[in-house]
Amino acid sequence: MTTVTSSSAGLSLSAERPKNIETQHEDMVHDAQLDFYGKRLATCSSDRTVKVFDIVNGTPSTTAETLHGHQGPVWQVAWAHPTFGDILASCSYDGKVVIWKDNGAGASIGASAPYGSQSAYGAPTSSAGGWTKIKEHTLHTASVNSISWAPHELGSILACASSDGNVSVLTFNNDGTWAVDLVAAHPVGCNAVSWAPAVVPGSLISAQSVGANAGAASNGEAKLVKRFASAGCDNTVKIWEFSQEANRFVEVEALQGHSDWVRDVAFAPNVGLPRSYLATASQDRTVLIWTQDSPTAAWSKTALNPISASAAAGAGSNKFPDTVWRVSWSVSGNVLAVSCGDGKITLWKENLKGAWECVSEMDS
C-alpha cells in the first residue's frame, strides 16, 4: 500500500503536522489533488488507477472509489471548476486522457450543468450513480504528462501536454461535441502545461462573463484572454495565446533560462497581484520565477536560492539538492510550493523588497 502526505495536495503555512493518508494504491503515487471546495481528494498511481476520497472534517475517508480506464501509469489528475459539475480528468503513460463525471450520490449538490442536463459532456445518464467515463482522448502518440483546466470564465477547456511534442486543447461545445486544437509546442517532448489567469492582473471579472469567448467584453467588462504556458525537453518555456485572426494558438514568448529539461510550469492566480507571475522547475535543479509588469512588457526572471533554506543544498549557486519536479501556487497566488527530488517540500513568499524567502520546509 502507498501513502501520500495531505499537505502535498494543498498549501499551508501552519505548523500542524502533515497527515499521512493510506491511499490503498499498489504502486507509486504520482499526484494528489483536492477539488475546489476541499471536499474530495483524487490520487493517481503507477498501478494504473485513480482513486477519489471524500474529505470529512479535514480527514479523508478510509475507503475510496477506484476509477479504472488507463493501461499505464497515471501521471496527473485535475478537477474541473464546480461550475461544470463533478468532473475529473486524468492522463497517463498510455497516451490517453480520460475525463470522468460523478453522477452518483457523492456529486456536488446544486452543481450547475451549463451545457444541458446531468448527461452533459455526452455522459450517459446512470440511475445506479457513480463515476462515468465521458471522454477518452486518444489523439496523442506518446505519454501524456500533464493536464490543466482553463479558468472557468473561458468555458470547459482542457490542455494536455505530451511526450510527442504536442499540446492538445479540448473544448466542450454547447452541442455536446468536443473541438480539438493541436499545438506543436516542443519537438523533443512536452512535460507540463499551465493556463494563465483569464484576465490581466488587476482586472475584475463580471459573473456575466462566465463561459464567454476570449476577446473584448461589452459594458466595460474585462477582456478575457486564452493563454497557457508549456514546458519542454528543449529547456524552454513557451507562452501561447489564442489569436482570433489566425483562429489558433500562436507562440507569443519563448523563455530561456534553464539548462536542462523543464519539468513543471505554473501560472500564479493574479487576484490582487500587480503583475503576472510564472514559476518553472527544471532537471537542472533550479526554480525560476518569471514576472511581467504588463501584457506588453518583457518577462524578467529570478532564481530561488535554496541555500538560505537548507545548508544541505547543492554547492552550485541557486541549486536545489536534486531535480525539482513540481511547483504549485496557493489560491491567492502569493505562496509557492516547491517539490524536490530529495523528498522535501519548501514554501516560498516574496518579501517587501522583492526577494523570495523560504518560509516553511517539510518532508514529503
Swiss-Prot record:
Topology of this chain in the membrane: Peripheral membrane protein
One cellular component term from this protein's GO annotations in UniProt: endoplasmic reticulum membrane
UniProt-listed Gene3D superfamilies: YVTN repeat-like/Quinoprotein amine dehydrogenase
GO molecular function, one term: structural molecule activity
Domain of life per record: Eukaryota
WD repeats: 24-63, 69-110, 139-180, 185-250, 257-300, 319-358
Protein name (database record): Protein transport protein SEC13
Compositional bias segments (type: Polar residues): 1-11
Protein keywords: Cytoplasmic vesicle, Endoplasmic reticulum, ER-Golgi transport, Membrane, mRNA transport, Nuclear pore complex, Nucleus, Protein transport, Repeat, Translocation, Transport, WD repeat
UniProt key word Repeat: yes
Name of a matching Pfam family: WD40
Database matches in PANTHER family: NUCLEAR PORE COMPLEX PROTEIN SEC13 / SEH1 FAMILY MEMBER, PROTEIN SEC13 HOMOLOG
UniProt GO BP: COPII-coated vesicle budding; mRNA transport; positive regulation of TOR signaling; protein exit from endoplasmic reticulum; protein import into nucleus
Subunit (UniProt): The COPII coat is composed of at least 5 proteins: the SEC23/24 complex, the SEC13/31 complex, and the protein SAR1. Component of the nuclear pore complex (NPC). NPC constitutes the exclusive means of nucleocytoplasmic transport. NPCs allow the passive diffusion of ions and small molecules and the active, nuclear transport receptor-mediated bidirectional transport of macromolecules such as proteins, RNAs, ribonucleoparticles (RNPs), and ribosomal subunits across the nuclear envelope. Due to its 8-fold rotational symmetry, all subunits are present with 8 copies or multiples thereof.
Organism: Mycosarcoma maydis
Protein family according to the UniProt entry: Belongs to the WD repeat SEC13 family.
Keyword Membrane carried by entry: yes
